[in-house]
A protein has these predicted regions:
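A substrate-engagement module of RecA-like helicase motors
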Residues: 2-24, 29-32, 76-208, 212-213, ...
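Structural recognition of the conserved hydrophobic beta-strand(s) that form the central parallel beta-sheet
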Residues: 86-87, 210-211, 237-238, 393-396
Length: 454
């Protein structure tokens, strides 16, 4: 018989009370699928397991897992309490959790005396998404008064730290005012820096919210024993879990674009290696020419498999030899040595027949070339990065099954051989046949269109 830690029965009892009594008093309907999902979340957390939870549209899955996580966290011993991580695919869901779901739920639970302090949460994202006050001041001083829209966006940035919420901010300005990878120790705004204050204010949140890429980046840091991006956590919820394999494929794909090549040459020139920069541009240009397709390029992004022709082999070898030579210069700065070695390492993959890599060339709509080396071991990498930690995990989405079967999703997520693995399905309460509308675009001809009679 399974024995549960103290608080298991109380958590399930309180979940029933919240969904059947408390939330209805605040104009929320009782949904049986939502209650069942909350109980599944609690069982998964207390058993320290992984659960695949498919919850159809209208189930109320977000509130279900939030209540489950809060009740579980509430009933844990104080010394064992750590944050819970919620990973999503979309910024919209992150914002909804942070500004709607959690504040409303926190207020209700405080009012009912279930919790004694507000639930705290923070969205974790890369520092390049936040405003650097020093760089903002410098950038604002350079923009002409006639550029009213640009001036207005920069003025808004003085009061909004997160650049994702600044309207009409150009990509160019984002790059010029974002927090740098390394803040100078002698920064004149360090004591008044909004970003540093943001970090201080959210050192110990109850819930950390991030996107799938940030979650995977944190896992990579842990495996490589580098400083973690997320504070150590005790449970993980992956919402929009059907998007996690796509994020992993992106994360585990190395790329070298035409812009990367141009940037590297520009950095060399700025570091007073003009002759070497010119030589590198020449071999990069030869490499790009060797990869030009023999067919007419369509006006859209395309990807084609990479094949190693003698011309390409010679061009790549020339690039690698020159990159090695430049990197060996005694007065070469460390940051440039790193960039040169990184570029060399990726190009070397295109010379070797690496069985764990899928090599292809990507061309943008305007014909710009990118070398791509994708891993064909994404499921294994996901398992190593996320599931082998044995932290309780809930993966939820409205689309995790195919004809009621989780097998395909388990394969993509690296969970095919994982045990024990829980499964849960809640059908959408909506009657799609009666309530869905079919919209037909205006250009479609109705002459030969036959609509169903039922």
């Amino acid at each position: 018989m399974q024995t549960y830690p103290t608080g298991y029965t109380e958590s399930h009892r309180m979940a029933e009370k919240i969904f059947r009594e408390i939330l209805p008093r605040h104009s929320m309907a009782v949904r049986e699928e939502q209650i069942a999902l909350c109980h599944e979340v609690l069982d998964t957390l207390y058993n320290k397991e992984i659960s695949l939870c498919e919850a159809g549209v209208g189930t109320g899955k977000t509130l279900a897992y939030l209540v489950g996580c809060i009740l579980w966290q509430m009933n844990r011993p104080e010394r064992m309490k750590l944050p819970i991580v919620i990973s999503t695919s979309s910024v919209a869901l992150q914002d909804a959790i942070l500004t709607e779901y959690l504040p409303d739920l926190s207020a209700i639970l405080l009012d009912e005396g279930i919790i004694t302090a507000p639930i705290t949460a923070v969205v974790r994202k890369g520092k390049e998404r936040f405003v650097c006050d020093a760089r903002l001041a410098e950038r604002a001083s350079l923009v002409q008064l006639s550029r009213k829209r640009q001036k207005n966006s920069l003025h808004i940035a003085e009061n909004i730290l997160d650049m994702d919420h600044i309207p009409e901010l150009s990509r160019y300005d984002r790059c010029r005012i974002c927090v740098p990878q390394s803040c100078p120790r002698d920064c004149f705004l360090r004591l008044d820096c909004r970003y540093q204050q943001y970090l201080r204010d959210f050192r110990k949140p109850d819930i950390q919210i991030c996107n799938h890429n940030y979650l995977l980046a944190n896992a990579s840091h842990r495996l490589e024993e580098r400083p973690l991006l997320l504070r150590q956590y005790q449970a993980l919820v992956v919402d929009e879990a059907h998007k996690l394999p796509d994020a992993a494929r992106q994360m585990y794909t190395e790329t070298l674009s035409a812009k990367d090549m141009d940037d590297l040459c520009s950095l060399l020139q700025q570091a007073h290696f003009k002759g070497l920069s010119k030589r590198l541009r020449t071999v990069f240009l030869t490499l790009s020419i060797s990869c030009t397709p023999s067919f007419a390029m369509p006006k859209r992004k395309i990807s084609i498999p990479f094949s190693l022709t003698p011309f390409r082999q010679a061009a790549i070898a020339d690039c690698i030899n020159l990159l090695q030579y430049i990197g060996s210069q005694p007065d070469m700065p460390h940051y440039l040595q790193y960039r040169l070695a990184e570029t060399e390492s990726l190009l070397r993959l295109f010379l070797l027949d690496v069985p764990t890599r899928i090599l292809y060339l990507e061309f943008s709509a305007d014909g710009q070339l990118t070398f791509c080396a994708a891993s064909n071991r994404v499921p294994q990498l996901l398992r190593s990065a996320l599931w082998n930690t044995r932290e309780p995990t809930i993966l939820t989405s409205g689309t995790l099954t195919a004809a009621g079967d989780f097998d395909h999703t388990k394969q993509l997520l690296g969970l095919a051989a994982y045990a024990p693995l829980r499964h849960f399905r809640a059908e959408s309460p909506f009657n799609y046949r009666k309530k869905c509308l079919l919209y037909i675009p205006a250009p479609v001809s109705y002459t030969h269109l036959t609509l169903p009679t039922t």
